[in-house]
């Protein structure tokens, strides 16, 4: 297995097989993705003839042959004489081929259907349509998108009434040539003065490339390598400022001047400013400038409309009885609330709800926010959208409210389209949108509902909609693929069942693998840290476990849940194969991904692999800062069964001050270290009372002094009970 990975990892087909290789061990049956039914006549092209004979010419000729019978309608003699009287028409003058005017092809190129132009925004400037066609057709840029930033208030630093266009070049040379031709085309056609940041002139690019090749040749002859990371050529990003063009502004200067309370100075901006961002594919994924502007635009629209913001709360209101909405039955409400409690909301405070109704007691236990009451007794929920809200921002509004309100706005099930105001307006805008955008937004809506554990939205519904999206040959972006994968791999363990349900169902894993297989055929990179980490966590236990032979009579060990030895070994075989894939593909993890990997290894009691991964973080050149050490000691303080590795854990304490930058002990670290000492050495209090001259006692006194001296920023807190 290891040799096959190392030798065949460069092949695209082998990459797909590597990702799916651990499925056979876990017992999941992999079925190929269903595709549309195509006949053999559609997939097999007709044979081509070598030459065009006269027989083929006769088939397409409009003149009848000599042997064919011609049916002639009887005509009056008067008409015949009139025709004979008419003088013969003069023959048309022959025009040579080099003097004939070239006619543009009326049929569009088939590749244009694969990459359509983005739709024009409201009130576009006249130049915009021609500019998009020139960028796509003449320059050959891919993945063109458009952001309308004219409604940003305050305007961005590039200027007011801004429209930003993004395009992907095939390489560095194509990037420079496209930017140069775009500037020349704007100067010639529209008499504009564009400014291109990062553009190298034609001769300058050739000179730098020639010098770079010469330096590489000299370095090769000297048996050395070029260490300069930035040579000034491979920036991969050129920003072309087209300038201010006529038309496209939303408000006229006279209307701005008449605004009440308008204070300012300077001149009004007339017209629209257009900026074209040209990047290579690698630079566009690295910078994600488009995503940054989209989030800024969505946040600005929320602020302007006065909608609730993330991590914000409304002022407290007078509590009262909660009644069900008029369109939802009590059974549905109670069922939805129980599912909504599974999503933790990151609010600074949580308020309980005082109510006498038994069927809504879950609201108080879950600590959800207070829902105000209408005069007629129905629940008053905030309006999510308005008529001016763009379609791409609708689903994002669901993430900015509480889970209970989001589940209410999502209606009964996946087929519900008009039970709530949100669904009614969402599907109305969906019917007017392009087919590919409508399909992508519907997938996003179902993904959010599954992550909220809505009872009416299932993973089979998501897979069905995703399958239709693939068969329709719509585009799939890496963020969209990761969102689908998160929804398919989402799972909440059930500790109340007998036996406890701690693993993702095999059917859900099969749906995720089929989606991965089809996305890999579209050219999306699968052997990266993000996809690998999602598969690794998805195939693992979601709580700390301990393997036992007799599950019925197994004792409880701390916070660990006993599982059968066969299930534990099956999961470990899958995890071992995934770890081999990571090593063979040389996948580099980020700091947050290392934290997830450490937690999974610790929950599975893989302590040897756990400490190897801890050392791997330092070998990868990542700083092990205070947050990482707090996570390490907190992980051990919340669980048992690691006492055999207590010396390894305690050796990390003197290593903290040797880190770069060093990590010094404060109150937060001292508290978790003291808890770990109490678990690893239960007799530590007796040693402290006897005042033994041991390193453990000195470490205990050091933690106690740090806790007593340092006052936390949030106010004084009592020391842990183990210190008393």
UniProtKB/Swiss-Prot annotation:
Listed name of the protein: ATPase synthesis protein 25, mitochondrial
PANTHER family: ATPASE SYNTHESIS PROTEIN 25, MITOCHONDRIAL
Skewed-composition ranges (Low complexity): 308-319
UniProt keywords, alphabetically: Membrane, Mitochondrion, Mitochondrion inner membrane, Transit peptide
Claim: DNA-binding is one of the keywords in the record: no
Chain segments carrying region Disordered: 36-76, 300-323
InterPro entries recorded: Atp25, NT_sf
Organism: Ajellomyces dermatitidis (strain ER-3 / ATCC MYA-2586)
Entry keyword Membrane: yes
Similarity-based family: Belongs to the ATP25 family.
CC per GO annotation: mitochondrial inner membrane
Segments forming a coiled coil: none
Membrane topology per record: Peripheral membrane protein
Gene Ontology biological process: mitochondrial gene expression; mRNA stabilization
Transit peptide, residues from-to: 1-52
The gene coding this protein: ATP25
Main location: mitochondrion
Role this protein plays: Probable mitochondrial mRNA stabilization factor.
Entry's localization field: Mitochondrion inner membrane
